[in-house]
Amino acid sequence: MNKNLITTAFAALLLIACTGMAGAHFTMVFPSDSEDTVWDVSPEDYIASLGETKTVYVMWGHPYEHISFDMSSAPEISVVKPDGTVEKLTPEKITVPGQHEDGTPGDFVAYRASFTVDQDGDSIVLVKYDDADENLIDYCKAVIHCGLEVWEGWDSEVAKEQTEVIPYTRPYGMEEGFVFSGNAKYKGQPLPDATVEVEKYHTLELGKEIVEAAEEKFSYDPPMVFTRQVKTNQNGDFSYTLDEPGIWFVCAAKESDTGGRTIRGVFIVPVLDSFPAKGSASSAELQKAIDEAKSAAQEAKAAAEHAASSATASPAFGAIFVAIGLFAALVITMRRK
């Protein structure tokens, strides 16, 4: 066989293998009103009103690159309510639009289930998904918060016999740049020296744009920015800074010691935009603001001097005119802003 042909074939196989490892698979749990809007998930979707019906969609794929795969089995879905009661939900098989690994569009097998938020506090949606192709079993948790200052239940242990991420940081009200800390456990015990993967979800168009930019800038290893990694300490503790707003996935894995299944605990963290919004004034804008402030001060001084010279009958009239002058200067400044 021609040597060049062998070399080309080997390179092609290597490329295919590398493509298959481009990103981490995650069980994604997104609250939504319909299949048409499921990919437009936001942190606010994880907030509920008392009596509201929440529908959660369960998908399988690479969140960062917005790559989807068919779910090979029906997930087990339950809701652990603030008082500890557990409601098992019936998953309904559906299809959702998405993107294949090669970038072509397609429809993918997914599931959905609904429940009524009937208690104030934090309800935890727990999804068990077994994917034989990837040799993975996920226990994925998403917190649905309800009620003014009823911050109870978000750190509950609900998968005690499996791998689970227990948050130390409350997973709502978090803004970009906050540090998320947690504890990884396996069968109720700390999971030391475990790999924790952290990955942010992107919509389809944004995912394409960011992946293309990453492949150009970090051609030597693009996936290193898709899936970040940290390690737990001897107590199973870990932390990571979630530096952008959006939906984040935090995943701790218990690797099998006997060639069996890898069991993972996945925790979903919705992250808000910075509040209040960060100022982004340039040096030129700051200098302009300083100049305007100086000008306004000079105008206020002139107005005060004019008011004082006009007050002939009584000092009280002078004080009134000074106040009017200062008020006028304030109005001028506010209008300029």
Regions found by a protein language model. Give the residues of each.
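Secretory targeting signatures
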Residues: M1-A24, K301-K337
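N-terminal soluble domains immediately following signal/targeting peptides that reside
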Residues: G23-I290
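C-terminal low-complexity, Ser/Thr- and acidic/Pro-rich disordered "stalk" regions positioned immediately N-terminal
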Residues: F275-T312
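A generic signature of intrinsically disordered, low-complexity regions enriched in glycine/proline
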Residues: I6-T8, D237, S295
